[in-house]
Every structure is written in C-alpha cells, then in structure tokens.
Regions:
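Anion-binding and metal-coordination hotspots
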Residues: 1-7, 25-573
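N-terminal basic/disordered segments at the start of proteins
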Residues: 1-20
Length: 573
C-alpha cells in the first residue's frame, strides 16, 4: 500500500537517504556525548544542526520560525532516520554543551565518511598520471564589534576591514569527478595572519589526503651548506671583537695601574694624573662599545645556529618521510600574497611542491618596476593585464631562484602592479598567459569561500561556544562536499525520463536555496520512491524516482563502498 507525505524541503529527502548510504547518520549516532537524554538524543540534535546547515538556514531559529519550519517536516526526519525533529532551542542547547573532544570526535566522523571519496579521486588522478592541485586561504568570520559573548574572538583583517571575529584556514582540492572539494578547515582567532599559517595549511592537506610529494632534500642539504658558510664572516667578526674587547680591558687595566702608581708618588704632576684618568675613561667607553658589538654579534650567531639546527632537524625529518613514502605524488599549491614570505616559499619548495604565489614583500615590486625600461616588451595576458617575467631570478632573501613576473593591471583608471613567483618544472616564463591563467585559477577557492558564506551562511555563526563554532565550520565545508557527492549519486540511481529533475545540471546554489526548500509529495511502496514536485513549485511537473531494486549503475565510482539505496516507494504515472 502506498504511503504519502508532503514536504517543503524536497531535495533533503534523497540527501537523507544518501547520508544513510555513506554511514553519516550511524557515524554521528555512535559518537559519545556527555549530555542528558530526554525525548531526543544529543546526537539527533547535532544531526539536525547539520541538516539545517545543508538546507542553507541563515539563523538557527529558522529551524522553527521559518515560513516552512524544518522541525515540522516529518518526511525529512524520516529520510534522515529520525522519528521527528526538535525545536531550535533544544538544538542550540545541545550544541552549546559540546566540548572540544566531542566536536573533534564528530569532525572525525565526517572525515571518515569522506575518506572513500578521497581515495577514489586519488586513484583516478594516479591512473591519469596527474598530480594534486591544492589552493589555500584564510577567510574571516566577523561578528558584531560590540559583542562580548563570542569566546576568544579577536580583532583582525576581514574583507578589507578591521573586525572582531575568527579566521578559518581552508584548503581546497581539485577533483576530476566533482570539481572543487574542501580538504580541511582550521579554526583561529580573528587576529591570525596568513603568513603564519602556510605550513599548517600544507600539513593539514597532507594529513587529510594521506599523500605528499617527494621532499627536495638535495636542495635543503645545499641550503644548509651555504647557510653555514654564510656564518663565517660573523664568526671572524666575533673573534676580532673578542680580541678588541680583551685589548681594551687590558689597556684599561694597565692605565689604572699606572694611575695608582702615579698617585703614590708625591712628585707626580696633576696634569699627568688627569691624563691617565681621561685615558681610563676612554678605555671604559671603548670596553662598553666593544661589549655591545660582541653581544649583538653573539645574539645573531645564536639565532643563526638555532636556525641551522632547525634546518638540520627538517632535513632529518624529510629524509625519513622520503623513505616512508615510496610512491610520492606530484602536487601544486597556489597561495595569495598573504602567504608569500620568503620563509614560506622556501619551506614549500623543500616540501616538494610546485608553487604559484604572489610575493608578500611589496619592495620587490618597486625593484622590478625599476628594472623595466620603455623598451621592455610586455605580454598581454588578460583583459586589462600585462606581464613581464624573469626566469630563475635569485632574490636577496630567498635561498632558491624563482621564476618572477611583474604584472600590471587597471582597476578603473588606476594602474596597479604585483609580483608573481613560481617554482617548479613548468617553464612558465615561456608562456605568460598560461602562467597568469594558472595562478588566477585559484579564484576557485575564493568562489568556494563565497559559496560557504552565501549558500551555507558560514559567516552567520549560529552558535556561541567555540567548540560549536568550530563544528559549524567543519560541517559547512562537509556540506559543500556532501552535496557534490550526492548529486553524482542521484544521477546514478534515479530513473531518467522526460520528467526527471536534472539535478546534475543545477548549480549548488539552486540545489540548496531552491530545490532543498521547495514543496513536493513523497510517495512510496514496494516499487520504489517517487519525489513529485508540487504544482506550486518552480519544478512543477518534475520528479525524482528511485527504484527499490538494483539497477546497473551508470558509473562504477560508488561500487567499492556503497550499497544500493534500499527505498520503499511507488511511481505515479
């Protein structure tokens, strides 16, 4: 017998069944949370919070107070294996009571659920002989500047303003099947700056993907050798300064001895005593100056030695990692100017990455501009952009030669310049339009950040405890990945006819803000499930039908880790 239910969140129905298939619901339910249980478990409330994020809810209260409240939609609750949903206040209390260990345990579930997708995409890339393409960035999550209820919020640069809030460090990855996918997010105070986070971004990407390139230990060995050699002038200066100090102290001692001897002789003229006293004071000042010089050199040498120790420690670590990584992958990282310090550039080079970055030091732009003459041939690379480049340029403070380009472009009537840097085997200086396009393709992460804020509303923090804020960040990037995985899954399992809603042809924004918030009728019996969009919906006349029996899949992508959607439903004709 057919069962029918109405829903105002149509796309959340198949998304719920997809969540069952990949083990998301059972994974969250298995996390131990130290909260009292009344009618609903805290795990169910955490799951409801995720569904709210997935549906593009702007404010937590919209769960109960929106035009079509999520907590009244029993069809969605059943699709997500819940008897019903709870009021938003209960969700808020459950999220507030989460501690850091519990939030991280839930985040680990999301990582575990995601792992088969990463493994599959990495296998595809290996089969195609392609490397990994990463993009990293730091994005601000501002709150009201007058707020005092957000723990550990701090003032920092956010969207060209100084705002109170937090920073989220994110890494995205280009997937051959799904396009942009998020790899990681790390929660930081609002005063965190990009230049301190480059290494953390790379390590987070490597931890999440389980892959890293071959470390360039030969370059690091050469760097250490040159680094030690660069200390030789300072060592010589230190020795000469020690000798100068000793000579000054000896001269002072001799002068004071002469002064004492002269004072014991009654016949000594006052002028002689005055001369010796002045000479002693001069030596005293000379000793003070010599000590300051020696101390300054000693501090520099100590810092230099400590840096050498750090480099040697890095070398040992990288050599060990190369031994433990018999099948390294090739990988590329793109970063904006905030990360482009010489130390960060050197580190990423030594870690084995091909690197595309803008330089952090604005002085290099002025130096490059001085190298340009009226006869310099500029290459047109974009609508309003031109570039000139120098291969393997050795910058003063960078241990490795870089491909350097000076870019000039217009914003309105104002001409601006920036410096791009590249390290890797790609001969970028022979094709500047390709270099320009490759670097600016990092706009994909900027588009991804925009999506998290304008589709999933990450910029509207729905909770005020820091562990819960972190979990909202994690759930938001997971939701962005989840909808992409689910779109392919729906296309593989839905019956295709002229009335089928083309979910795969819809953008993510339309899927979330429209399809996940529109009305439909859910009809099911032994044949399968039919999601028929209502006549009042923008998708009137469209439907999604899933058969209960297995169909030959259109792709084998999910076969290693999915079972077929086991639904009970009826197709209306």
């Amino acid at each position: 017998m057919a069962q029918e239910r109405d829903t105002h969140h149509a796309l959340l129905i198949p998304l719920g069944h997809f969540a069952q298939e990949i083990g998301l619901i059972s994974g969250i339910e298995a996390v131990k949370l130290s909260q009292k249980i009344y009618d609903h478990t805290p795990q169910a409330k955490v799951l409801e919070f995720f569904v709210a994020v997935l549906s593009g809810t702007q404010h937590l209260q919209d769960i109960s107070l929106a035009g079509h409240p999520l907590d009244k939609d029993l069809a969605v609750a059943e699709a997500w294996k819940q008897m019903c949903w709870v009021d938003y206040t209960s969700v808020s209390r459950a999220m507030k009571q989460l501690n850091w260990n519990e939030s991280k345990a839930i985040a680990s579930v999301l990582e575990h659920v995601s792992q088969p997708f990463w493994d599959s995409e990495l296998a595809v890339l290996r089969s195609q002989g392609c490397g990994l393409q990463y993009d990293g960035d730091l994005t601000g999550l501002p709150v009201s500047n007058t707020s005092r209820t957000y723990p550990n919020a701090a003032y920092g640069h956010m969207s060209d303003e100084i705002r109170l809030g937090y920073q989220a460090a994110v890494v995205s990855f280009h997937s051959p099947t799904y396009g942009r996918l998020w790899l990681s997010v790390d929660h930081h105070a609002g005063d965190t700056v990009s230049c301190t986070q480059a290494e953390a971004l790379v390590l987070a990407a490597e931890k999440r993907s389980g892959q890293h390139p071959k470390r360039r230990t030969e370059l690091l060995q050469k760097r250490i050798k040159n680094f030690v050699k660069s200390r030789e002038p300072a060592d010589e200066r230190f020795c000469s300064q020690q000798a100068a100090l000793a000579a000054a102290e000896q001269a002072k001692a001799e002068t004071l001895e002469k002064l004492r001897a002269a004072q014991e002789i009654p016949e000594t003229k006052p002028k002689r005593l005055q001369t010796l006293e002045r000479r002693g004071k001069r030596y005293e000042k000379a000793i003070e100056v010599a000590r300051k010089k020696l101390s300054k050199t000693q501090v520099w040498l100590n810092a230099h030695v400590e840096q050498e120790k750090a480099l040697r420690k890095r070398l040992l670590q990288f050599e060990r990692e190369n031994i433990e990584n018999p099948q390294p992958i090739e990988a590329c990282f793109r970063l904006d100017a905030g990360f482009g310090t010489y130390d960060n550039i050197a580190l990423l080079i030594e870690m084995g990455y091909e690197l595309y970055v803008k330089l952090h030091n604005h002085k290099i732009v002025e130096q490059l501009k001085q190298s340009v003459t009226p006869e310099t041939a500029w290459t047109h690379v974009g609508n309003n952009a031109e570039m000139v480049a120098w291969p393997e340029m050795q910058l003063k403070s960078c241990p490795y030669p870089l491909d350097i380009a000076l870019e000039r472009f217009y914003t309105g009537k104002t001409q601006k310049h920036s410096a791009l840097a590249h390290f890797g085997s790609t001969p970028v200086t022979t094709n500047l339009p390709t270099w320009f396009g490759k670097y600016n393709a990092r706009q994909t992460i900027e588009a991804g950040i925009k999506e998290t804020k304008q589709v999933f509303f990450l910029n509207r923090l729905k909770v005020r405890s820091e562990p819960a804020i972190y979990l909202q960040e994690v759930m938001t990037i997971f939701a962005a990945n989840f909808i992409r995985w689910a779109t392919v899954w729906i296309e593989q399992h839905v019956d295709q006819d002229e009335n089928t809603l083309p979910v795969g042809e819809m953008g993510i924004k339309k899927q979330i803000q429209v399809a996940a918030n529109t009305s439909a009728k859910v009809i099911q019996n032994s044949e399968g499930m039919l999601l028929r969009f209502s006549p009042a919906s923008v998708f009137a006349g469209k439907q999604l039908f899933f058969r209960a029996s297995r169909k030959p899949p259109r792709s084998t992508h999910f076969l290693p880790f999915f079972t077929i959607l086991d639904l009970i439903a009826q197709k209306l004709r």
